[in-house]
Curated annotation (Swiss-Prot):
The keyword RNA-binding does not apply. PANTHER family: TRANSCRIPTIONAL REPRESSOR NRDR. Belongs to the NrdR family. Pfam families: ATP-cone, Zn_ribbon_NrdR. It comes from Prochlorococcus marinus (strain AS9601). Residues 1-21 are annotated as: Disordered. This is Transcriptional repressor NrdR. GO terms for biological process: negative regulation of DNA-templated transcription. Keywords: ATP-binding, DNA-binding, Metal-binding, Nucleotide-binding, Repressor, Transcription, Transcription regulation, Zinc, Zinc-finger. A zinc finger (unnamed) spans 3-34.
Length: 159
């Protein structure tokens, strides 16, 4: 690692610790030439993921786009900003894990719905209404009925 003050490439590591929820390593270093101390962060470089669109197009995965869509669905719910960020990070991890460079946009949408359904029913309905292009009240009612049915099944399995 190059020293920011003298550009020497020899340094020693004074301290290492996990950072960013285990996704990177923070290292405190000291230059062997000028004794300047500095901090570096190391993280695994991930391969870019391409999203295969329904129209046949392809674009790079955009975490900000994911965050925007989920944030809109979670407006005025009990989801905090930090919970949304953690939720998006979790979805991103699943996308990277599930894909081998390419992932279908429909797979991302279903992944979000599956996870939102567990976390917040209101956010789930909001996201589903946009993702599945609800045309009217009947679409909302059928989705609410399926939510209601799965809630009853979960309660029955607990009893």
């Amino acid at each position: 690692m190059q020293c920011p003050t003298c550009q020497n490439t020899d340094s020693r590591v004074l301290e290492s610790r996990s950072a960013d929820s285990g996704k990177s390593v923070r290292r405190r270093r000291e230059c062997l030439n000028c004794s300047f101390r500095f901090t570096t962060y190391e993280r695994v470089e991930t391969m870019p993921v391409s999203v295969l669109k329904k129209d046949g197009g392809r674009e790079l995965f955009d975490k900000q786009k994911l965050f925007t869509g989920i944030s809109r669905a979670c407006e005025k719910t009990n989801f905090s900003s930090e919970e949304i960020i953690n939720f998006v990070d979790g979805i991103e991890s699943q996308i990277v894990q599930d894909s081998n460079k390419d992932i279908k946009s429909s797979h991302i949408g279903e992944l979000i719905l599956k996870n939102l359904r567990k976390e917040n029913e209101v956010a789930y309905i909001r996201y589903a209404s946009v993702y599945r292009k609800f045309n009217g009240v009947k679409d909302f009612i059928s989705t609410l009925e399926s939510l209601k049915g799965s809630s009853k099944n979960q309660l029955a399995s607990i009893s």
